[in-house]
Amino acid sequence: MKALILVGGYGTRLRPLTLTVPKPLVEFCNKPILLHQVEALVKAGVRHVILAVSYMSELLEREMRAQEQRLGIKISLSHEKEPLGTAGPLALARELLTDNQEPFFVLNSDVICDFPFDDMLKFHQQHGREGTIVVTKVEEPSKYGVVVYEGDSGRIHRFVEKPQVFVSNKINAGMYIFSPAMLRRIQLRPTSIEKEIFPVMAEEGQLYAMELQGFWMDIGQPKDFLTGMCMYLQSVRQQAPERLRAGPGFLGNVLVDPTAVIGQNCTIGPNVTIGAGVVLEDGVRVKRCTILKGAHIRSHSWLESCIVGWSSSVGQWVRMENVTVLGEDVIVNDELYINGANVLPHKSITDSVPEPRIIM
């Protein structure tokens, strides 16, 4: 089986992290976002993954060649010369997707969940139509485009953009499975699959919805990245609790790379991910944070709801909070207060940042 992953975007919502690393390679819970998806696809029997790429594709290609060997699969890159939206990339990769008549998966690159690929395939084969989209339940449907479908069969009737009156609380979760016949609908030009292709398929009775069980998050921006981390760690707690760090000083769900070094009298958690080679000195307090590879947090600093970029350094007695994001190789001097700052790569912070802002 095959899968196409849409990784062509610039990752602007996840800046400053994506200024130096393409979004699919940003580590989410100590593994690149893309690998969470690819490994789940391989588990479900996918043997050929096609990446629809544009931005920073050399870095992606290098990383994926190594993974190709490790996972024993084929990975192809389909290069967009211009942005093709969410449907155009399927037309661009048409030849790769249609060399047999098997259905294929399509994924948005920002989605994290308990990927239900086996269930999707079964459901798709049962109804026998051209397309299946996974839907997930949300608390505030008025913020999203919702999917209206028959509860028993899953047949989709229509899509409603940001409804002011309740019609459904199910939204498109960014995971699809299609039969190759569906590709005849798409031309090689910038096209939105959600706005231009799906409504026509639904009208013709060719599109079905499968409801996702378990957690789901679009982790394309920092606050959602952190929320998604909390959900993912809770899922690890339920399915593989031995992967989480326990013991004195660790509270709740904490994932620590074995190469990280943690000093005395630290309090870590709940909901913390600590990457490879990270150093936390004595007396550090961290909650609801992701600390990426090679970062160094000096003694007695206090971090909550932050993402600390690769090889960044946070001084002593610093307080950082409110979705502060440090890009790669940022230095924060001692005894500063950082509130909701977005700090671009390779910057040094010498003064406190009392109000949320971008530091360039």
Swiss-Prot record:
Catalytic subunit of the GMPPA-GMPPB mannose-1-phosphate guanylyltransferase complex. Catalyzes the formation of GDP-mannose, an essential precursor of glycan moieties of glycoproteins and glycolipids. Can catalyze the reverse reaction in vitro. Together with GMPPA regulates GDP-alpha-D-mannose levels. This is Mannose-1-phosphate guanylyltransferase catalytic subunit beta. Pathway: Nucleotide-sugar biosynthesis; GDP-alpha-D-mannose biosynthesis; GDP-alpha-D-mannose from alpha-D-mannose 1-phosphate (GTP route): step 1/1. PROSITE patterns: HEXAPEP_TRANSFERASES (PS00101). Component of the GMPPA-GMPPB mannose-1-phosphate guanylyltransferase complex composed of 4 gmppa subunits and 8 gmppb subunits; the complex is organized into three layers, a central layer made up of 2 gmppa dimers sandwiched between two layers each made up of 2 gmppb dimers. Catalytic activity of gmppb is reduced when part of the complex and binding of GDP-alpha-D-Mannose by gmppa induces allosteric feedback inhibition of gmppb. InterPro entries: GMPPB_C (IPR056729), GMPPB_N (IPR045233), Hexapep_transf_CS (IPR018357), Mannose-1P_guanyltransferase (IPR050486), NTP_transferase_dom (IPR005835), Nucleotide-diphossugar_trans (IPR029044). Mg(2+) binds at residues 110, 218. Keywords: GTP-binding, Magnesium, Metal-binding, Nucleotide-binding, Nucleotidyltransferase, Transferase. Its cofactor is Mg(2+). It is an enzyme of class 2 (transferase). Its EC number is 2.7.7.13.
